[in-house]
Amino acid sequence: KTWEKQVKVGLGTDIGAGTSFNQLQTLNEAYKVQQLQGDKLSAFESLYHATLGGAKALSLDDKLGNFNLGKEADFVVLDLKATALQALRQQRAKGIEDALFALMTMGDDRNIHATYIFGQKAYVQN
């Protein structure tokens, strides 16, 4: 309903409005809240609101939110199969949205393989 009224919406973490600093867990919680309200939130919509949607909500979409040339490149590389259960679930994914949905609902810190800040690798999981 909020989106229908053209309100800018972003999904992010800051603990004040959620329960975790982990973006994947926040996406999972947003999905559950939408379900409880009788609304649907697809994996693609969730990813949008966590990236470009969030940048637009903060009026930073000229600098952040996607991989367009000239934008700041702060991003994480995710391992969709970080745990045995996730690997099993990903084997049964019916497509990219299903794979993203599984990551969104089962993911946590273990899925972060690498972190880049301004395009420079800042962290790699051992």
Residue ranges with predicted function:
Residues 72-126:
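C-terminal cap of metal-dependent C-N hydrolases
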Residues 1-87:
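His/Asp/Glu-enriched, well-ordered alpha-helical/loop segment
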